[in-house]
């Protein structure tokens, strides 16, 4: 997995978090969750330094869907997005931005 691919996915996540939210803020957050997951799914986590490891732990916690039920098949990320507090949303946005910058600096 390349730094470039991860940087691209996190740039996409950051972009969908920006206004406007044509399908609603919750859907934008759920889409950003998905982009982050794609960016990290095959990335070797041993490559993270101390700072980025902290951001990854925060991201993992914010995106955690264990214990969430989805009886209407809306999608676990959408349900999780609805559960985020304003502080969680701010933290998520900040972490996505920091990681996108971190990946971008290393892609070359």
Give, region by region, the residue ranges found by the protein language model:
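Short terminal alpha-helical segments
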Residues: 1-34, 93-100
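Non-transmembrane, amphipathic alpha-helical segments
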Residues: 2, 17-21, 25, 44-51, ...
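Generic N-terminal initiation segments characterized by hydrophobic and/or small/turn-forming residues
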Residues: 14, 37, 56-59, 65, ...
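Generic signature of intrinsically disordered, low-complexity segments enriched in small/polar residues
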Residues: 6-8, 13, 36, 46, ...
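Amphipathic alpha-helical binding modules
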Residues: 71-108
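Amphipathic alpha-helical interaction modules
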Residues: 19-68
């Amino acid at each position: 997995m390349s730094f470039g691919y991860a940087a691209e996915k996190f740039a996409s996540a950051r972009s969908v978090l920006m206004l406007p939210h044509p399908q609603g803020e919750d859907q934008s957050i759920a889409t950003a969750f998905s982009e982050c997951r794609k960016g990290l799914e095959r990335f070797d986590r041993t490559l993270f330094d101390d700072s980025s490891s902290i951001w990854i732990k925060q991201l993992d916690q914010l995106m955690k869907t264990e214990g969430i039920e989805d009886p209407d098949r809306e999608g676990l990320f959408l349900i999780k997005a609805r559960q985020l507090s304003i502080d969680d949303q701010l933290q998520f946005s900040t972490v996505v931005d920091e990681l996108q910058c971190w990946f971008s600096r290393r892609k070359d």
